[in-house]
Amino acid sequence: MRVLVPPAERSQDTRVGAPAWREAAQAMARTAHILTDRCGQEAVTMWQPKDSVLDPNVAHHLGRAAYIQPWRFRVEMIKGGGTLEKPPPGEGVTLWKGKMKPPAWYARLPLPLHRKARALQTTEVVHAHARGARLTAARLGRAQHQINGRVRQLLRQREVTDHRLSEVRKGLLINQQSVKLRGYRPKSEKVPDKADSMLTWEKEELKSMKRKMERDMEKSEVLLKTLASCRDTLNFCFKERLQAVDLMNQPLDKVLEQARRHSWVNLSRAPTPRTQGQKTPPPDPVGTYNPACALALNEAKRLLVESKDTLVEMAKNEVDVREQQLQISDRVCASLAQKASETLELKERLNMTLGLMRGTILRCTKYNQELYTTHGLIKGPLSKVHLETAEKLDRPLVRMYQRHVGTQLPEAARLAQGTDKLQCHITYLEKNLDELLATHKNLSWGLNCKNIGHEVDGNVVRLRLRQRQPHVCYEQAQRLVKDWDPRTPPPRSKSSADP
């Protein structure tokens, strides 16, 4: 049975030990308890994230509920009145059964796998550097490929422009030959006309087109040299990037596709609908995308835009020059053909006039001969022995009548007057006949000049139409400009001179 001690007796200290000794033991226990709580709290705090430390002024269950609230799934309304639960965005482990997604946990102390984690991190950095180097090399290779394509396009356009320039130069040679051929016309046909003005105008226009084509050739040559220099720079950077990594068994185009890229121009451009492109990293002197690569790619982009504009301009100028040259040639040929038709019309008129004058000359010549015959008949024979009795001026009848005073007959005077009058008319007729012959000669010379002029203009038109054909090259047209008369055959070669 339990014995109850009275209060007076309970207050009495029955312990044997000294109070100081007991206080020292209790102080040591309290110190150990405080140290145990502090070390345990610090150990737990070291393993917890920084944001997981709860406020000591808030109840533990309330603080924990507020802490894990962002981890819970979010309920969203969908069309039709239903709901859809989605995990919160960000990194972490999705717990579908508990409908929570805790964030990634980062320890503040090294874990037991710290060495392996650091090795994996180093490997990841090295692989990232290799991927970046391969991506930069792929971009450089793609840029070099596009620069090569643009160089080929520029070379083809230069061939077209050079062909057009040779056509313009051939047009200048044809113009020079046309002027030279027209210089062989007679002096009367060299009166300045619209055909000469058209030839002069054609020469000036062809010179202007020649200067335009030469400027395009010079500009394209400078651009071609710049593109070649940029290509060499891209090739050097490309090989330099490939020296930093070990090549994998995949083409560099696959590297761009793995990076979700379909172009090397700019990683910050608007992505395609299928992929989300990565942004171009800033140039890093010690990284994979160094300033030299950035400068080479920027120069390549600038040259691609500039060369595209230059190609469009050169193609447009070539088309304009071709059409303009054809129109000018057609207008000059039309003016020369019109001049030839006008010359033919004048030649026909001169030919008709010459025919009429030839008939008049024949009639005048015949009439002059008849007048000479009449003049001879009036004057009579040269010898008296040939005179008939009825024609003698001293025949018996006349002598018998003229014996009387004042009976002189006017027969001799009348014959002399008629002879003189007939002689004057013959002289006047011969003068007119000389004028007719001189005019006939001038008309014949003019008709011959018109024939030569018509033939020369026709030859010039045929020459121009024949030489402007595409199969006639510049060298063939250059052989036409020689210092020889086209009306004379060219000298034969020594091999064909002697059989």
From Swiss-Prot:
Protein name per its UniProtKB record: Tektin-like protein 1
Localisation: Cytoplasm, Cytoskeleton, Flagellum axoneme
Domain of life: Eukaryota
Keyword entries, A-Z: Cell projection, Cilium, Coiled coil, Cytoplasm, Cytoskeleton, Flagellum, Phosphoprotein
Residues the record lists as Phosphotyrosine modifications: 372
InterPro entries xrefs: Tektin-like, TEKTL1
Pfam families: Tektin
Keyword Coiled coil: yes
SUBUNIT field: Microtubule inner protein component of sperm flagellar doublet microtubules.
Function: Microtubule inner protein (MIP) part of the dynein-decorated doublet microtubules (DMTs) in sperm flagellar axoneme, which is required for motile flagellum beating. Forms an extensive interaction network cross-linking the lumen of axonemal doublet microtubules.
GO BP of this protein: flagellated sperm motility
Organism: Homo sapiens
GO-annotated cellular components: axonemal B tubule inner sheath; extracellular exosome; sperm flagellum
Coiled coil ranges: 197-227, 297-317
Broad class of the protein's primary localization: cytoplasm
Gene: TEKTL1
